[in-house]
Amino acid sequence: WYDGLLSEWNNETAVQLGPDNYDTIGGWRIYEVTCDDPGLSKPAFLSSKLVEAPNAEEAAALDRYVERFVWGGLQCTEQEPYPYGIYGIPDWHVLRNSKDEDVRGKLHIWRIYDYPHIALMYYNLYRMRRLYPALPLSQSAETYLIRAARTLIAMFTIPLELDDWSAFGTGLYNELAAEDILKALEKESMPDLRLRLERLWNRK
């Protein structure tokens, strides 16, 4: 289930961290390996790096992460009840298979902090598609941009609906990507999506 995960290497123990071996991470903190800020900052960083310094092997790894780990796993697809929702801790596999049908299980998609990391990743994938069309990426530039915008829209709407957690009053890592995403939506002639995101962003 975690095929494509961007893993970390523990230099001290020479172990690659993953759901089959959390190494020195124990208890509830195992989330650090796959999700939350520790897990989701890695694709945000790698995608930002690839815009400035493209590398085909790294782009392929990021693409595998998106196609096999994020879309339909970590993040809800457009065919699910809450499109673009992002699963929280301990990991999406546990939550999707939970017997709890509510916000502590299958609807644990209310953590506002998770959304900007993934939105930034998609925005950078959009830029990579535009700047370096030869890189091995599975989706179109338009698809990545739409996902970036709709991930931010989901950040403002899904947590508020499910758990009364508002993204309007808290500063979030990587949320300033919204400014660039709005400019890109205007450039790509997506006025309806731009207006919807702009209303939410301006309110904040």
What are these regions (language model features)?
Residues 1-204:
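Catalytic cores of extracellular degradative/oxidative enzymes
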